[in-house]
Every structure is written in C-alpha cells, then in structure tokens.
C-alpha cells in the first residue's frame, strides 16, 4: 500500500503567474509530440517538412483543448453546461475528455489534409504515433492531482488518495494504469507498427483499436465520474460507451485496408 504524496497543485509560480501540474503535463505532452513529429519529418522520404510539423502541432493543440473541453461538458457534465454555458471556457476548473479531444483532432486532420494536399489518412497516420505522449502526460497529471482514482483494492500497489471522497482506503491507481497502457504501451505498439510501410489508414486503425481496448479495460477498475455513475449493468461507464465506436472504427479501418493493396503511407 502507498499513500499519495498530495502534491501542491501549482507546479511553478512566476510572480502572479501560476502553472498547475495538469497544464504542465499537457505542455510536456505537446512538446514531446512536436519533437517526435520533427524527428519523423527529418527521415528520408517522409514527405513532411519541419515547418509543416510546427503548423500541425499548433492546430492539434487547439483541436485537443477545444474538443476535449467541449466533449467533457457534453458527454460528462451536460446539466452544468446548460446551466452555465460559460463553464465551457473555465478550463482551470478541470474536465477534459479524450473522446472530445479525439473528435477535435479528427477535425484538424481533415482541415490540415486539405490544406497541405496530404489527404486525411496521410495526416492521421503521421499523427497517430505522436498522440500517446499527450495521453501519458495527461494521466500523470490526473495522478498528481489525486483525481479519477479506481475502486478499492487490497493489492500491494493500492494507493490511498487524500480526497475525503476516496474514503481513506487503498484504491487502484487507475491513472497510472492508463498512463502505462494508453501512453507507453500504445506508443510502442503504434510506433513499431508504423516503422514499416502500411496501407492508408492502417496505423490509425491500430491506434483506435488499442486505445479503445485499453480504455475499456481500465474503466473496469476505475470509478465513474460521480455526476454520471454507471450507465448500465452496474459497471458500464461513459468512457467505455464512448470507446466502443472508437474500437469499431479502428477495426473497420483495418478490415477496409487489405494487406495486399498498394501502400500509400
């Protein structure tokens, strides 16, 4: 059993400016994605320039932040949004949704593909290996904040979180499970898969299937958002429900892009 260290929510203070851990983790995730994107662009035959990566990551930041916040309010806290629409811009109060951010990124991919002539899948497959860095950093931010914990457990790595709502009992550190699976493991899988030429959309398909399965599995030991609870069967969460179409979409991509077709990465 471990006791959560109860970090100061403010990571850095520069006079009147305070940077919270969650925001810092997002910054680290985007910076890592940018560096990896530039590395991929530098490889011979990539078809990408460093400037294009700079532009893409800039648009991605907007897509993730706007989509993630809007998705959270619509999927997880709709009554609060309807009661106070201005809560949408109160990002400092927390509340970001991967699935909303995913939709925001899809919009960016479509726009950037048209803008550069690379096409939707050309941009999507290039972007897929970059995304796990942000997912990893975001989940570490959740753990530092002591939020989104799991169910009670007697496993030796259970963590006692400081929030009184956690009941003072050891719980699954579901944030770390997600960081390892949706971040580290997903990066390794997608990176290795993308190291060889694949059919258009295949890399994106692997990303969607693996992310959806990892998220669905961890949600089994993670407590649902208190304002929603379980949606059905005493275990189905909103995160699982939203992950199902992501998995189906990924499977469709892999089935649609047959291995014997011409590679177009």
UniProtKB/Swiss-Prot annotation:
Main location: membrane
Enzyme Commission no: 2.5.1.145
Keyword Cell membrane: yes
Function: Catalyzes the transfer of the diacylglyceryl group from phosphatidylglycerol to the sulfhydryl group of the N-terminal cysteine of a prolipoprotein, the first step in the formation of mature lipoproteins.
PROSITE patterns in UniProt: LGT (PS01311)
InterPro entries listed in its UniProt record: Lgt
Pathway connected to this protein: Protein modification; lipoprotein biosynthesis (diacylglyceryl transfer)
Subcellular location: Cell inner membrane
Gene Ontology MF annotations: phosphatidylglycerol-prolipoprotein diacylglyceryl transferase activity
Name of this chain's protein: Phosphatidylglycerol--prolipoprotein diacylglyceryl transferase
Record-annotated membrane-spanning stretches: 17-37, 56-76, 92-112, 117-137, 173-193, 201-221, 235-255
Xref: NCBIfam families: lgt
Species per Swiss-Prot/TrEMBL record: Solidesulfovibrio magneticus (strain ATCC 700980 / DSM 13731 / RS-1) (Desulfovibrio magneticus)
Highest taxon in the source lineage: Bacteria
Family from the record: Belongs to the Lgt family.
Any Pfam family hit: LGT
Residues binding a 1,2-diacyl-sn-glycero-3-phospho-(1'-sn-glycerol): 139
Keyword Transmembrane annotated: yes
Keywords recorded for this protein, A-Z: Cell inner membrane, Cell membrane, Membrane, Transferase, Transmembrane, Transmembrane helix
Gene Ontology cellular-component terms listed: plasma membrane
Underlying gene: lgt
Taxonomic path: Bacteria, Pseudomonadati, Thermodesulfobacteriota, Desulfovibrionia, Desulfovibrionales
Membrane topology note: Multi-pass membrane protein
GO biological process, one term: lipoprotein biosynthetic process
